[in-house]
């Protein structure tokens, strides 16, 4: 592609020789594939949760800890990933993330063979560490591949592939995992002999092998393509790092930036709310709708992903025409209202409200992210790393919601937790609205 860079201040890809904007179609397409791939891993967790809950006899709280193991990997990796990218490049962070992703997924084969729950959790942790690298690199990279003014649009466009990956993951998981071995009622399980029960539970676990081996192959293929593709270098990679100083100096500067601090809190709440809502949606349906099975309830989970996908398209269109923080405020307020309906109405009404809520979650993550890293300049890498670290919210809010549901004796009451999270996001959006014109 020639001698290229992305300016730190304007965040615009240019050709040094021609002095004109360049179109990085192939790099952008490969970056979009990463958004697809990490959506697959994230949303397969919502399939694994009810599968492991029956196979390993877990309570709602214990099942929520699956997300804790997963998101802890997200929590610890962004800072090391940011340091790696500072010393090398965004591309190095992406390749590292893909290899970790493949390694973690590969562990599912031996874990299923020996039916070792701990090894599954280790695999999920490693997958999440890889995804943390990918998100730390890809999210800011997408925002700087062009004019800063259209960074929100590019990130939301890339996140559309994330929504598509979420739909594929649920359909993929439903057909190859949940439907492969039908879940049995407790009455049926009680009538099984110890040998039959053991064989049945092992069959539930073995059903995850094929899907995750397919994932390993695809991830390694994408890693190879990225290794062979030339990506534009960021000017900060080559010129600004000397001025950036130490990690502590960067953190000190970031701590004084109010919109970044709010973005960290808002993103923690968003990931927590989204993960909790999706993780317990199948349980919500089974508990609230008489005769509902986990396999059929997965159709509602697919519906949430379709709503998410549609919401992403409409949200991206709205953001191209209205101020991003105003669209975010409206979406957060509607999502909060739908969670409250699911908490107090229950039944089919609550389930439909919970399904529709995903349409209004759709643009929240990328919009919070792009608002949070705006004007961070030389601190963009570390600033984005901290925002990615807030994904630990999915590992904290989910078990909290599980604990509340166990204590209340039902899932709907626990929907008040994500409603509270969306209220915080609404406050963040209003904060952005008040300061955007100052």
UniProtKB/Swiss-Prot annotation:
Contains an outward-open, amphipathic cavity. Contains only two acidic residues along the transport path, Asp-46 and Glu-135, which can undergo cycles of protonation and deprotonation. Asp-46 and Glu-135 have an essential role, coupling proton translocation and substrate recognition. Sugar binding probably induces a conformational change in which the outward-facing cavity closes, thereby bringing Trp-38 and Trp-278 into close proximity around the bound sugar to form an occluded intermediate. Optimum pH is 5.5 for fucose transport. The record marks 46, 135 as: Important for activity. Signal peptide: none annotated. This is L-fucose-proton symporter. It is a multi-pass membrane protein. The keyword Cell membrane applies. GO terms for molecular function: arabinose:proton symporter activity; fucose:proton symporter activity; galactose:proton symporter activity; hexose:proton symporter activity. PROSITE patterns: MFS (PS50850). Keywords: Carbohydrate metabolism, Cell inner membrane, Cell membrane, Fucose metabolism, Membrane, Sugar transport, Symport, Transmembrane, Transmembrane helix, Transport. Residues 2-26, 88-90, 145-150, 228-257, 320-324, 373-379, 431-438 are cytoplasmic. GO terms for biological process: arabinose transmembrane transport; fructose transmembrane transport; fucose metabolic process; fucose transmembrane transport; galactose transmembrane transport.
């Amino acid at each position: 592609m020639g001698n290229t860079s992305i300016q730190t201040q304007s965040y615009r890809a240019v050709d040094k020789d021609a002095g004109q904007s360049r179109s990085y179609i192939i790099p952008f397409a490969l970056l979009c594939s990463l958004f697809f791939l990490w959506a697959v891993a994230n949303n397969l967790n919502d399939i694994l949760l009810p599968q492991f809950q029956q196979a390993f006899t877990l309570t709602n709280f214990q099942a929520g800890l699956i997300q804790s193991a997963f998101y802890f990997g997200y929590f610890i990796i962004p800072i090391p990933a940011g340091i790696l990218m500072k010393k090398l490049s965004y591309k190095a962070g992406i390749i590292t993330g893909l290899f970790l992703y493949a390694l973690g997924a590969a562990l599912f084969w031996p874990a299923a063979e020996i039916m070792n729950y701990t090894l599954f959790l280790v695999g999920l942790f490693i997958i999440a560490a890889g995804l943390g690298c990918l998100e730390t690199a890809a999210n800011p990279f997408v925002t700087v591949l062009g004019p800063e003014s259209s960074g929100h649009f590019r990130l939301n466009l890339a996140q559309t592939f994330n929504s598509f990956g979420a739909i594929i993951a649920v359909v993929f998981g439903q057909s190859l995992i949940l439907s492969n071995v039908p879940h049995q009622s407790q009455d049926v399980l009680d009538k099984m002999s110890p040998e039959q029960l053991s064989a049945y539970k092992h069959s539930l676990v073995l059903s995850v092998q094929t899907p995750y081996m397919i994932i390993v192959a695809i991830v390694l293929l994408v890693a190879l393509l990225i290794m062979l593709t030339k990506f534009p270098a960021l000017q900060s990679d080559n010129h600004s790092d000397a001025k950036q100083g130490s990690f502590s100096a960067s953190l000190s500067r970031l701590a004084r930036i109010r919109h970044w601090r709010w973005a960290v809190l808002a993103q923690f709440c968003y990931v927590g709310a989204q993960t909790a809502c999706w993780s317990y949606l199948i349980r919500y349906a089974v508990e609230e709708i008489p005769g509902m099975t986990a396999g059929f309830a997965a159709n509602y989970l697919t519906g949430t992903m379709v709503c998410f996908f549609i919401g992403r398209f409409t949200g991206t269109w709205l953001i191209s025409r209205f101020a991003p923080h105003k669209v975010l405020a409206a979406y957060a307020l509607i999502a909060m209202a739908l969670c409250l309906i699911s908490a107090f109405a229950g039944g089919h009404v609550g389930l439909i409200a919970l399904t529709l809520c995903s349409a209004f979650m759709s643009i929240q993550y990328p919009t919070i992210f792009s608002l949070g890293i705006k004007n961070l300049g030389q601190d963009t890498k570390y600033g984005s790393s901290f925002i990615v670290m807030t994904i630990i919210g999915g590992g904290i809010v989910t078990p909290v919601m599980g604990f509340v549901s166990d204590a209340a004796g039902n899932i709907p009451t626990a929907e008040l937790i994500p409603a509270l999270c969306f209220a915080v996001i609404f406050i963040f959006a209003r904060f952005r609205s008040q300061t955007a014109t100052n």
